[in-house]
Amino acid sequence: MARAFFRRRKSCPFSAKDAPRIDYKDVRLLQGFVSERGKIVPSRITAVSAKKQRELAQAIKRARHIGLLPYIVK
């Protein structure tokens, strides 16, 4: 009988004790969660929890609105 394949659960990078805070002014952090085309990368790829993904999306949208991040990258 073959063993079942168990995928290792990824942990959220923002749930650790010394994890960085999600802030719209931290452009370097936010750029890691935006694709090269300027789209927000989904949480199934980045392993961010649902709550933190919502906070991250809101921070990216804020940074775009005030001009810290571009809406699209050519």
Swiss-Prot record:
Q: What does the subunit section of this Swiss-Prot or TrEMBL entry state?
A: Part of the 30S ribosomal subunit. Forms a tight heterodimer with protein bS6.
Name the record gives this protein: Small ribosomal subunit protein bS18
Q: Which family does it belong to?
A: Belongs to the bacterial ribosomal protein bS18 family.
Please name the GO terms of the biological process aspect recorded for this protein, alphabetically: translation
User: By which gene is this protein encoded?
Assistant: rpsR
Task: State a single Gene Ontology molecular function.
Answer: small ribosomal subunit rRNA binding
Q: What does the UniProt record say this protein does?
A: Binds as a heterodimer with protein bS6 to the central domain of the 16S rRNA, where it helps stabilize the platform of the 30S subunit.
Keywords attached to this Swiss-Prot or TrEMBL record, sorted alphabetically, are: Ribonucleoprotein, Ribosomal protein, RNA-binding, rRNA-binding
Q: Which GO CC annotations does the UniProt entry carry?
A: cytosolic small ribosomal subunit
Question: One Pfam family for this entry, by name?
Answer: Ribosomal_S18
**Span of the signal peptide:** none
